[in-house]
């Protein structure tokens, strides 16, 4: 399971906050390939084309951010694929703290992102 860097940005819970984050990244031509902005923590989780540049752009725009390691999987877009991946982590005693996923209509694969208790062990 590949481990990738995820940018986590703390934002105010008000209209325009996500737009400002995205604009700061767009101004530096940084592509957002994954997004989660759920939960009461007021944190936006992002997979981006250039994590280091994203961190600098966000700091310059006045945001607090940090990098986290997450597991990003490309799974077949069919029933049972996610269940098998989750079971594999469970067998290794790795807890899934959160997850988000996306697939394009008609796509053959889905991208699943898990924040896990031990990214290094999940990668093996």
Predicted stretch roles:
Residues 1-124:
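A conserved regulatory-domain signal marking ACT and ACT-like small-molecule sensing domains
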